[in-house]
Amino acid sequence: MFANKKVVVVMPAYNAQKTLRQTYDEVMAQNVVDLVIIVDDASHDDTAAVARKLPHTVVEVHPENRGYGANQKTCYKLALEQGADIIIMVHPDYQYTPKLIPAMASMIGNGLYHCVLGSRILGGCALAGNMPFYKYISNRFLTFAENIFTGAKLSEYHTGYRAFSRQLLEQLPLDANSDDFVFDNQMLAQILWLGYTIAEVSCPTKYFAEASSINFSRSLKYGLGCLWTALQFRLAKMKLIKSKLFPSFS
């Protein structure tokens, strides 16, 4: 709980057996989280079994793998159903430190922002944290291009550490988004489309053996999807196209 607002952490999980408990323990150690929602996207390991042993959790298991974006759709749906006022996504692979949860929750709970990102780029230590060089370069290039198309000034669009207000999540047309990794990018573009300011806090970078990552071919597909999303945003702003991602909001 923060300022009488219910704080819910959502964890989109896939084969996270080795790191789930460690991540969960650190999340709860922050003393502001009321509930953790874990959605297992048909893992091949014991992620679901580990999750069900954790207190103060709601566990949902997809019977078949539906994709990272679809996992998040379930996460946010459940969070809203549970009465969440502040929703924070933390990956259960321990790549993002849960120690930033109080800061992110305070920025939402005090009404300063409706969306806060944990940026690995702001601190300038992404490479020192073992982010692969090709990922760093692609992150910087994509972010530069996306800022041009959207008019924003974010340091990165590609972090999986995010906090949202209930008010914001209820406005987003998330069902129109991809079920794959580009969901993340589409979501941020939709937030900007609505006219919200996105805040950022510096987040340490941690890449290690157990941290989840996508291969080069899927990274390429994701990158192209990000550019297409940003282009659609600009064309829709110019009223040259209509897009289900960016409908006319009244």
Regions found by a protein language model. Name each.
Residues 1-4, 151, 175-250:
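Hydrophobic helical membrane-anchoring modules
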Residues 8-12, 37, 61:
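Short hydrophobic beta-strand elements that form part
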Residues 15-29:
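Short, well-formed alpha-helical segments that are part of the catalytic scaffolds
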Residues 16-19, 43, 97:
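Donor nucleotide-sugar binding loop of glycosyltransferases
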Residues 40-49:
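A conserved acidic beta->alpha catalytic loop
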Residues 62-81, 98-181, 208-217, 224-227:
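Acceptor/aglycone-binding surface of glycosyltransferases and processive sugar-polymer synthases
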